[in-house]
């Protein structure tokens, strides 16, 4: 399961717009910034700092995040958001990444599934 390029935030200008909106939500593993837009679908940007490890490890984290977002796709609202990985995420399994990411996305009201957990 992959995310099409139209679902990704790629340009620096777009990242800056999302960060300048100052709507941020965080848990121990991730920070999410969001921006309400008039897009027909959501767009996601990923940010993994060099402090988290070498390129292979950072790319693994981004792959896990993209896969988790692809699984969450039916539950995501039509907004732009950026996910920033915090230290400690490099040791998590895919299931732990999904759990932590779902938690922070629910806090930000980006993930909506109708369940109260």
Swiss-Prot record:
One Gene Ontology cellular component annotation held by this UniProt entry: ribonuclease P complex
Q: Does the keyword RNA-binding apply?
A: yes
Q: What class of enzyme is it?
A: hydrolase
Annotated PROSITE patterns: RIBONUCLEASE_P (PS00648)
* Domain of life of the organism encoding this protein: Bacteria
Instruction: Name any one Pfam family assigned in the record.
Output: Ribonuclease_P
Query: What Gene Ontology molecular function terms does this protein carry?
Result: 3'-tRNA processing endoribonuclease activity; ribonuclease P activity; tRNA binding
Q: Which reactions fall under this protein's catalytic activity?
A: Endonucleolytic cleavage of RNA, removing 5'-extranucleotides from tRNA precursor
User: Can the keyword Iron be found in this entry's annotation?
Assistant: no
Q: What is its EC number?
A: 3.1.26.5
Q: Keyword annotations for this protein?
A: Endonuclease, Hydrolase, Nuclease, RNA-binding, tRNA processing
GO terms (BP aspect): tRNA 5'-leader removal
Family designation: Belongs to the RnpA family.
What the protein does comes down to: RNaseP catalyzes the removal of the 5'-leader sequence from pre-tRNA to produce the mature 5'-terminus. It can also cleave other RNA substrates such as 4.5S RNA. The protein component plays an auxiliary but essential role in vivo by binding to the 5'-leader sequence and broadening the substrate specificity of the ribozyme.
Q: Subunit structure, per the record?
A: Consists of a catalytic RNA component (M1 or rnpB) and a protein subunit.
Protein name per Swiss-Prot or TrEMBL: Ribonuclease P protein component
Q: Which gene encodes it?
A: rnpA
